[in-house]
Amino acid sequence: MYMLNNMLNDVPTPWGMFFQDSATPNMEGMMELHNNVMFYLCMMLGFVSYMLYNMLTTYNHSVLPYKYLYHGQFIEIVWTTFPAMILLIIAFPSFILLYICDEVIAPAMTIKAMGLQWYWKYEYSDFIDDKGETIEFESYMIPEDLLEEGQLRQLDVDSPIVCPVDTHMRFIVTAADVIHDFAMPSLGIKIDAVPGRLNQTSALIQREGVYYGQCSELCGVMHSSMPIKIEAVSLGEFLAWIDEQ
């Protein structure tokens, strides 16, 4: 009897050509939409390729076989209605997913992320420390010469975000200087951090793990030095971490 263990891909990989493994319902919906759209695109590509091949071979062996045919009403209707139907089939699930991802459903906690050149600042506005102030901290990328065994180059930080699983969370994202972007591929999050503006998104992490993201908006010479690290833990471990702050 063989035991098969899943190896989850929650970090960027060299020459990666596909999505990271999903950890939220939103990301699962995005991957399903991508697969459905690719199915229709492959069908259209195959059909158009067949038609082009058929036309080339037909006209190659015949000398103007349809020289008196100026138009075909039926085929004109087909090539107009068929693409329109395909676009509608693609559009409806896309719009539904778009509105679902934009909806913030009764968040149990809020995390504020502020982008600065070139680090992140986080605030847990629902929790206070011993001084009666909200819990906040800055997160910097660990330099390559200080990395420990098992840490990832240009992805690990000194102070990661810690959050509980199976909890509706709201991320409020802004910036203090230039435009940044808070992106977490495994969570299906990518939202601009704009100075003077508060953007929000939500996440429901369904499994424990460590997730990595990066600033996805060119923000200066040290743009690549703004990684994001989220540690998703159980509720008990999260409350213990809060008590230590």
UniProtKB/Swiss-Prot annotation:
It catalyses: 4 Fe(II)-[cytochrome c] + O2 + 8 H(+)(in) = 4 Fe(III)-[cytochrome c] + 2 H2O + 4 H(+)(out). Its EC number is 7.1.1.9. Mg(2+) binds at E217. One of its GO terms (molecular function) is copper ion binding. The keyword Transmembrane applies. Cu cation A2 binds at C215, E217, C219, H223. Cu cation A1 binds at H180, C215, C219, M226. It comes from the Eukaryota. One of its GO terms (cellular component) is mitochondrial inner membrane. Binds a dinuclear copper A center per subunit. Component of the cytochrome c oxidase, the last enzyme in the mitochondrial electron transport chain which drives oxidative phosphorylation. The respiratory chain contains 3 multisubunit complexes succinate dehydrogenase (complex II, CII), ubiquinol-cytochrome c oxidoreductase (cytochrome b-c1 complex, complex III, CIII) and cytochrome c oxidase (complex IV, CIV), that cooperate to transfer electrons derived from NADH and succinate to molecular oxygen, creating an electrochemical gradient over the inner membrane that drives transmembrane transport and the ATP synthase. Belongs to the cytochrome c oxidase subunit 2 family. Component of the cytochrome c oxidase (complex IV, CIV), a multisubunit enzyme composed of a catalytic core of 3 subunits and several supernumerary subunits. The complex exists as a monomer or a dimer and forms supercomplexes (SCs) in the inner mitochondrial membrane with ubiquinol-cytochrome c oxidoreductase (cytochrome b-c1 complex, complex III, CIII). This is Cytochrome c oxidase subunit 2. The gene is COX2.
